[in-house]
């Protein structure tokens, strides 16, 4: 099958990791996969074509649709799979013109406004990564529940062997993993404010293409390091005593045997235990 994956991130996100992981597995199984996106950082085994979906002016949207139709025709694309609001808008129109199916994956909560309810752009079928997002789409955006399936983040578990943490050592390494923009950035900022003066904790902040100005107050703290984007997330999780994050990062931490404080954009779970594992997922 010839598949087109559409992303729109400006920095590495869970959606990119999801999309690339899925695409590489589809290629291994004999499919042809092309990715279109504003940027692409993770290693991808197929062809990447740049389309700047975050440029949302009318003429830019028209150019995006034209580019998509050209790719669909040249590569004989049979299905498009979009992973973001920005990309799904243009893909919805292109797929209707080309008369091919659009599948979408919703990785997080969506803005609720009238235009989103009128022009949903969720495709023929939509996938959500958890039950809470499914409920959100049904109750707040009016998406047909029969067109939604829950499929959790695809993770190669061979990268995340279970290793017990040594909680008796004096200095603990706390890893905050996620981008520093948007709601996740607000969460990271509040966590750093809370922990910055705790003497026996070393904090590593992983993720974020650039450090927002408001985080500058933490740059001179000897116990806080901003590592930016790193390729060896499994190794960083392995060397952590506590992970703070959400989404696929949370699942990766649990698989690795690391204590996890789950803080998402819309919900605070806290320290994940057997008692709250199901709602955390």
Features from the language model and the residues they span:
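Nucleotide-sugar donor-binding and catalytic loop/hinge architecture
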Residues: 1, 161-173
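N-terminal strand-loop element at the rim of the active site
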Residues: 5-60, 208-215
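Acidic donor-binding loop of glycosyltransferase active sites
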Residues: 77-79, 235-251, 257-261
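Short His-centered aromatic/hydrophobic patch
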Residues: 82-88, 106
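Carbohydrate-associated surface elements
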Residues: 132, 154
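Conserved catalytic-core segment of nucleotide-activated headgroup transferases in glycan assembly
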Residues: 170-211
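Nucleotide-activated donor-binding/catalytic signature segment of Leloir-type glycosyltransferases, i.e.
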Residues: 207, 212-230
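Catalytic binding pocket for nucleotide-activated donors in carbohydrate/polymer assembly enzymes
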Residues: 251-281
């Amino acid at each position: 099958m010839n598949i087109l994956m559409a992303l729109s991130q400006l920095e590495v996100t869970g959606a990119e990791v999801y999309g690339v992981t899925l695409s590489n597995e589809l290629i291994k199984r004999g499919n042809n996969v092309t990715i279109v996106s504003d940027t692409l950082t993770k290693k991808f085994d197929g062809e990447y074509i740049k389309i700047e979906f975050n440029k949302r002016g009318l003429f830019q949207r028209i150019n995006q649709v034209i580019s998509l139709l050209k790719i669909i025709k040249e590569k004989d694309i049979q299905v498009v799979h979009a992973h973001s609001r920005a990309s799904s808008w243009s893909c919805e129109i292109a797929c209707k013109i080309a008369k091919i199916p659009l599948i979408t994956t919703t990785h997080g909560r969506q803005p609720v406004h009238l235009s989103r309810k009128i022009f949903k752009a969720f495709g023929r079928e939509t996938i959500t990564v958890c039950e809470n997002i499914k409920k959100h789409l049904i109750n707040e955006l009016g998406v047909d529940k029969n067109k939604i399936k829950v499929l959790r983040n695809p993770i190669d578990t061979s990268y995340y062997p279970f290793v017990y943490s040594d909680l008796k050592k004096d200095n603990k390494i706390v890893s905050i993993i996620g981008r520093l923009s948007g709601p996740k950035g607000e969460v990271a900022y509040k966590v750093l404010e809370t922990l910055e003066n705790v003497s026996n904790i070393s904090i590593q902040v992983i993720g974020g293409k650039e450090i927002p100005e408001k985080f500058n107050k933490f740059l001179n703290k000897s116990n806080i390091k901003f590592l930016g984007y790193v390729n060896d997330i499994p190794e960083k999780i392995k060397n952590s005593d506590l992970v703070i994050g959400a989404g696929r990062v949370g699942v990766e931490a649990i698989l690795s045997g690391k204590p996890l404080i789950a803080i998402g954009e819309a919900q605070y779970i806290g320290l994940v235990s057997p008692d709250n594992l199901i709602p955390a997922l």
